[in-house]
Amino acid sequence: MNNSNRIRLTWISYLSYALTGALVIVTGIVMGNIAEYFNLPIASMSNTFTFLNAGILISIFLNAWLMEIIPLKRQLVFGFILMLIAIAGLMVGHNLMIFSISMFIFGVVSGITMSIGTFLVTHMYEGRQRGSRLLFTDSFFSMAGMIFPIAAAMLLARHIEWYWVYACIGLLYVGIFVLTLCSEFPVLGHKATDQSKPVVKEKWGVGVLFLAIAALCYILGQLGFIQWVPEYATKTFNMNISQAGQLVSNFWISYMIGMWIFSFILRFFDLQRIVTVLAAMATLAMYLFVSTDNPAYLSYYILALGFVSSAIYTTLITLGSLQTKVSSPKLVNFILTCGTVGTMLTFVVTGPIVANNGVHAALETANGLYLAVFILCLALGFFTKHRSHGHVTH
């Protein structure tokens, strides 16, 4: 593979994470406007976004096998067509069923693209470089989380219809589409058998289970928190939508900066120990945010939370890939799928909590999930295989 093609494929990976980040994170900003558009309570409206998360989960799960059957390039081109259909559905269709179908299509496109992006990074890069590349790739999720809430808040403040926010997000896929047409992709499945190394079957071990559950709890906790921050800030502290959007953007700015910094720092630490420390600090930072009565402190706490939690998810995935001597794409996809289950469950879990006990209770639940991540990471120390496989970095 020549270097220019590798760079194009790497940028496809970056944009795939940005696309998923934009679709998932912008929900908290536009949800109130969409609920008003369809004349529904916001707690009921949140349930329809489960279609987005379900699409992501199903496509990531199935694509572990479909990547070996349908060429990656064809999948991405088809994804572009689906993206156009979904955006057109939001603009032309004015009923809840078409909205739900469009959200599901967004999820399918996002999941396919993200799973391909993750595979490309793990396929093209080895060893320490893989972990730092995954972390940098994941930072584009955060970058989208920084840019699109601000853009969405600006559009909504100017009374521009909410569906134009999704049209703006669609521009990311235009970039993916153009790069796809110019790139050559790795060949998977039977056609690649002759060129591939013999597959070494290894038992994953109980450590993978701990990592998978931690990934689920982390994503569910993170999204369960960040999706309700705008509603919490506007209703509890009487902030306007721009101020609430700025809180969300502050989180993702800090998250992105943290990813860039930790991509250099992590190589000097044992991954299991550092992720345990980061999970503890993130739990504390979220507790301070949820507990404070002073709105002036919210920005400080959410900045701290974004920074210390930035490396947790990617480190969990990297630790998973190090549980076997030979990295297993299916193992990585399994942990990624479990994280996506957390995405899908976001409104399934938090929607009823908000309806029955209020937004603050949903944020407290998210804090409890972060505590669970800390406990799982601590327990992982007794089961992890990355040290015995010689994967410890110094």
Curated annotation (Swiss-Prot):
UniProt entry keywords in alphabetical sequence: Cell inner membrane, Cell membrane, Membrane, Transmembrane, Transmembrane helix
Membrane topology: Multi-pass membrane protein
Transmembrane segments: 11-31, 51-71, 76-96, 101-121, 134-154, 162-182, 206-226, 246-266, 274-294, 302-322, 334-354, 363-383
InterPro entries: MFS, MFS_dom, MFS_trans_sf, MFS_TsgA, MFS_TsgA-like
HAMAP family found in the cross-reference section: MFS_TsgA
NCBIfam families xrefs: PRK03699.1
Protein name (Swiss-Prot/TrEMBL): Protein TsgA homolog
Species for this entry: Yersinia pestis
Gene: tsgA
